[in-house]
């Protein structure tokens, strides 16, 4: 509150903003399905749906999307059931999913603005609408198998999938000479393919009521932006920009990180300028992708009679994360990792500034005195000279290829890497203890008195421990998502 104990909305320290919007759309749909089975071991499911949407033009407002799935129980069809083999199943499917546009994407209209001198004003949108929009379409294929062995003590589930999303409705940048800065278009073809594996096991089960359930899962997904427009003129689409760009770039994985980088020589060494500071690339470069290479998890549940203890560990390997927090924290010097080089105690080098303005490193810690205003002075070449202990020598090479020997102040160094996006991109891999739960199932005598069939009390803890991570920053789920598929 701006003023204590004054309970009104206008008394908020952060003033509230509000707006009025009204959207209307009409959508109709028809759906049908057919389910067939043969001798209870072969199954076929067919579905079809047709939607009509008012947000699409009359010629394209109807879109149909079907699906077909089939499965065969091999253990039943060929009589393979035994004590060792309980269940074998193969399955496959193909489907399409359609989607319409947001309301009012077909025609450019005027919007009301603040009145001028009592006269109402209206303005035209800078977004060019499209009267020829088509519905989005996503096609998917999937295949897999399931198996269970030894009285279901070991279960396996494998799935392979591929999805293609086409005709995505995007706002693409256009030349301002057209009167608009962007235009709504059907664009974008993104392909995802991958596989998922789930393994369940009961390693221990005793007659006295002890049971150990183990579940493992693993998944890997590969995405690729196939194209953004039919003409091939658009090569990238910006999803987000703040210190770094997140792009959908043709030929690359969805969610590419794009930004400034260190200038490096042919051997990968950082190149410094004449002052000893890292050089910044003049063009943006690919710095990684925010999607992981694979994810996985391990779940264990130990139960004994009415008690059970479970814990879940999950992992994400690969992918990159950009930290605006670290970027700003380095510039302002509020992060603990910016202590490095800021004084001699934290590895800072002693130096003085020569008459020509260049910094000269002192060979060792000088015998210095401190003035009343906290400045350091030492004898250099027989003269009392102001000296500094916040020197950093960047590990790299000069433009001529020789080893860098220039000293820069820690402040200038951290200010320089503020402008280098690569310096603030981190490996997003982690392994976490995601959840621990302890449960107690109440005795049946108690639940019967409460007219309950069953009840339990559970103590749960989540996100308790980051077991492994490469970067110094806290890694969790992304805080900004702007998907186009």
Describe each PLM feature range.
Residues 9-12:
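Outer membrane beta-barrel transmembrane domains
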Residues 17:
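Thiolate-centered catalytic microenvironments shared by cysteine-dependent enzyme domains
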Residues 1-5, 22-31, 35-38, 43, ...:
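Outer/extracellular conduits and scaffolds centered on Gram-negative outer-membrane beta-barrels
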């Amino acid at each position: 509150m701006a003023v204590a104990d004054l309970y009104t909305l206008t008394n908020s320290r952060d003033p509230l903003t509000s707006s009025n919007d009204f959207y209307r759309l009409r959508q109709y749909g028809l759906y049908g399905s057919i389910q067939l089975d043969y001798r209870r071991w072969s199954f076929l499911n067919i579905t079809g749906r047709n939607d009509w949407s008012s947000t699409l033009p009359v010629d394209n407002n109807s879109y149909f999307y079907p699906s077909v799935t089939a499965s065969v129980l091999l253990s039943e069809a060929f009589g393979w059931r035994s004590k060792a083999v309980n269940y074998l199943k193969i399955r496959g499917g193909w489907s399409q999913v359609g989607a319409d546009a947001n309301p009012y994407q077909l025609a450019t209209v005027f919007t009301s603005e603040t009145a001028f001198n009592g006269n109402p004003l209206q303005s035209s949108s800078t977004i060019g609408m499209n009267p020829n929009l088509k519905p989005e379409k996503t096609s998917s294929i999937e295949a897999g198998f399931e198996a269970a062995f030894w009285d279901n003590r070991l279960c396996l589930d494998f799935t392979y999938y591929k999805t293609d999303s086409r005709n995505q409705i995007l706002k693409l940048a256009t030349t301002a000479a057209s009167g608009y800065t962007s235009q709504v278009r059907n664009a974008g073809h993104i392909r995802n393919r991958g596989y998922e594996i789930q393994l369940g096991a009961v390693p221990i089960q005793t007659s006295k009521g002890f049971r150990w359930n183990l579940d493992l899962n693993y998944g890997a997904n590969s995405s690729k932006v196939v194209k953004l427009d039919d003409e091939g003129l658009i090569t990238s689409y910006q999803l987000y920009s703040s210190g770094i760009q997140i792009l959908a770039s043709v030929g690359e994985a969805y969610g590419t990180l794009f930004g400034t980088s260190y200038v490096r020589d042919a051997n990968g060494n950082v190149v410094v300028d004449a002052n000893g500071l890292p050089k910044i690339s003049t063009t943006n470069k690919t710095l990684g992708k925010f999607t992981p290479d694979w994810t996985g998890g391990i779940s264990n549940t130990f139960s004994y009679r009415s008690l059970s203890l479970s814990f879940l560990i999950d992992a994400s390997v690969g992918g990159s994360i950009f930290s605006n927090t670290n970027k700003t924290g380095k510039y302002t010097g509020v992060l603990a990792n910016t202590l490095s080089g800021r004084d001699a105690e934290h590895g800072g080098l002693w130096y003085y500034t020569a008459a020509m303005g260049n910094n000269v490193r002192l060979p060792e810690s000088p015998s210095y005195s401190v003035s009343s205003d906290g400045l350091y002075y030492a004898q250099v070449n027989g003269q009392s000279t102001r000296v500094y202990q916040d020197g950093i020598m960047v590990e790299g090479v000069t433009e001529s290829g020789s080893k860098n020997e220039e000293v820069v102040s820690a402040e200038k160094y951290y200010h320089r890497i503020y402008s280098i996006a690569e310096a603030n991109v981190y490996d997003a891999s982690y392994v976490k203890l995601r959840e621990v739960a302890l449960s107690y199932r109440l005795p049946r005598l108690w639940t019967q008195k409460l007219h309950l069939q069953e009840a339990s009390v559970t103590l749960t803890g989540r996100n308790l421990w980051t077991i492994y991570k490469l970067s110094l920053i806290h890694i969790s789920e992304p805080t900004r998502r702007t998907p186009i598929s």
